[in-house]
Structure formats: C-alpha cells, structure tokens
A protein has these predicted regions:
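Catalytic cores of DNA base-excision repair glycosylases
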Residues: 1-197
Length: 197
C-alpha cells in the first residue's frame, strides 16, 4: 500500500466529520459520490444546523441509515455551534458528545485532523488485527488497547489507515488474498492454516 491515508474526500475538519459519520455501514466510494453536493450546501455548521430534516435527507437518502444520519447531522452541527463555537473539537472525549459521533469517529477525527496518537478500530482494523496477530481482543475496546500499546504514538495514525486499507483490498472478510499478501510470514492465521481462511 503506497499511501496510508483516508480515502474519504474532505476540505475541512467539519467536512471530514460529516464524511466519517456518513461512512458508517457505507463505503467511502459511495460517500465520496455525495459529499461534493453536501459540502457545497453546508460549508459550515451554521448552514447545516439551520437545515430542515427533509433537505438533509434528500442529499443522503442513498447512503445507509439516512433517517438517523440526517437527524444526527443537524444535531451535531447545532452542538458544534452551541458548545464549541462552530469548531470541530480536537479531543476524542469532546467529539463523543456530538450526536452521531462514537469512539471510532472521534478517534478518526482526532487522528487525521489533529494528529492525536489514537487508533480508530472499525470492522477492517478489528479483523486484520486479529488475523495477523496484533491482538487477541474479542471486542473493539480490547483491540484498540492492544494496538495503542503495540504501536508507537507517532505511527498510530498511519497504522490505522494501513490496517483499514489492508482489510479492504487484501485481507478481505471473504476470500482474503493471502497469496498476494506481503505479510504471509508474519500472519498468525496464515501460519496456522497455511491457506486462505
């Protein structure tokens, strides 16, 4: 993998926050198809906070869970204005106070925008970490803890993106591409099975 960075398109911390929230249970490719119109209509939290549910819904209706995401986007924008002066906060704990923002989203924003030494664990990071042997954790929190302990602070952001991309394109959920994986010699699952899962 040449570049370990987000595949989501964005031009500001606020727009990355929108994109990451929309990406839950949806592909980055689909989110990127819709974000140009969303970003043009909502350049800042003010415009989004003032928008109607129907207006937001129409822009995101082909993204998974549009009802919840539309409500959360409007609430999130309002809280950014009321609690954070319209700025996206840098601390994960503050980010998690925003509607629709959980630990994974908070860690993505803190890492990508503010270079905080945190690792966001999504389905790809969880799967790859357990398969290759970086963690034996049975839940997201345990895997995050293991990865945080296992990677130096300055590499955690890159590790997060590398694990995501490796999970999307090589160590896929179904039919992983073990034969073309550069980690065969290091991979616990490959060593145990000596074949694809």
């Amino acid at each position: 993998m040449e570049r370990a960075e987000s595949e989501l398109h964005y031009d500001s911390p606020f727009h990355l926050l929108i994109a990451v929230i929309l990406s839950a249970q949806c592909t980055d490719k689909r989110v990127n198809m819709h974000t140009p119109q969303i970003f043009a209509r909502f350049p800042s939290p003010k415009e989004l906070a003032e928008a109607s549910f129907d207006e937001v819904y129409q822009l995101i209706k082909s993204i998974s869970f549009p009802n919840n995401k539309a409500m959360h986007r409007i609430g999130m924008a309002g809280k950014l204005i009321s609690d954070f002066g319209g700025e996206v906060p840098s601390e994960p704990a503050q980010l998690e106070t925003l509607p629709g923002v959980g630990r994974k989203t908070a860690n993505v924003i803190a890492s990508v925008i503010y270079d905080k030494p945190v690792i966001a664990v999504d389905t790809h990071v969880f799967r790859v970490s357990r398969r290759i042997g970086l963690s034996d954790g049975s839940n997201v929190e345990a895997v995050e803890s293991d990865l945080t302990a296992g990677f130096p602070a300055h590499l955690r952001g890159k590790a997060h993106h590398w694990l995501i991309l490796h999970g999307r394109y090589v160590c896929t959920a179904r039919k992983p591409k073990c034969e073309s994986c550069g980690l065969q010699d290091l991979c616990r699952e490959y060593r145990l099975n000596n074949l694809c899962l």
